């Protein structure tokens, strides 16, 4: 499965990057996230474990994510029920208080049974993830360095929900 989503957001790239990197906060605004913990974090990498629970399906995913704040974070699977799982977040500053977010993910479950059980659930999660961060940005505190100008966020058309 290939997923590509993008959105224009009335927040700085730094602010959006910080929301994306803060996996420990995901349970507060992602209804499918039953738990999350940061395993390690430094200037170049963040590693996290996320428990996904949605419509009776529950599994854990551990990723190690190389990053370049505020414009890029890779998503690299360390552990989880996937044969393939790789993705990225790209953030492009458009103005001091606006940016473009791009999310891409390619994944394939490691077993046909898991694909049937969790595939549609995970499809829904990945296809609504960018929108969830846009909503979160509208309710989160703007960092002191960023202007407090509010602009409505706009989701742009998704370019993919292609099955491989």
Where are these regions (language model features)?
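A conserved amphipathic terminal alpha-helix motif
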Residues: 109-164
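Glycine-rich portal/gate segments that line the openings of hydrophobic small-molecule binding cavities
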Residues: 37-79, 132, 136, 162
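Hydrophobic pocket/interface hotspot
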Residues: 16-20, 26, 48, 101-103, ...
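Beta-strand/loop substructures that line and gate deep hydrophobic ligand-binding cavities in soluble
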Residues: 76-128, 164
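Beta-strand elements of well-folded, non-transmembrane domains
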Residues: 9-13, 52-56, 67-69, 81-83, ...
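A short, structured loop/turn motif at beta-sheet edges
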Residues: 13, 40-44, 66-70, 90-100
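Hydrophobic ligand-binding cavity/cleft-lining segments
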Residues: 1-43, 143, 153, 158-164
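Hydrophobic/aromatic beta-strand elements that line small-molecule binding cavities or substrate pockets
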Residues: 5-7, 36, 61-66, 86-93, ...
């Amino acid at each position: 499965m290939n997923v590509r989503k993008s959105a224009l957001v009335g927040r700085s790239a730094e602010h959006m990057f910080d929301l994306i990197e803060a996996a420990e906060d995901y349970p507060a605004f992602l209804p499918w996230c039953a738990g999350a913990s940061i395993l390690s974090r430094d200037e170049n990498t963040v590693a996290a474990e996320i428990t996904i629970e949605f419509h009776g399906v529950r599994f854990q995913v551990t990723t190690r994510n190389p990053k370049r704040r505020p414009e890029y974070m890779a998503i690299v699977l360390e552990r989880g029920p996937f044969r393939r799982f790789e993705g990225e977040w790209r953030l492009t500053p458009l103005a001091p208080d606006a940016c473009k977010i791009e999310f891409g993910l390619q994944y394939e479950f490691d077993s046909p049974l898991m694909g049937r059980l969790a595939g549609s659930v995970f499809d829904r999660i990945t296809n609504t993830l960018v929108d969830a961060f846009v909503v979160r940005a509208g309710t989160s505190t703007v960092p002191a360095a960023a202007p407090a100008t509010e602009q409505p966020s706009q989701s742009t058309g998704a370019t993919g929900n292609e099955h491989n």
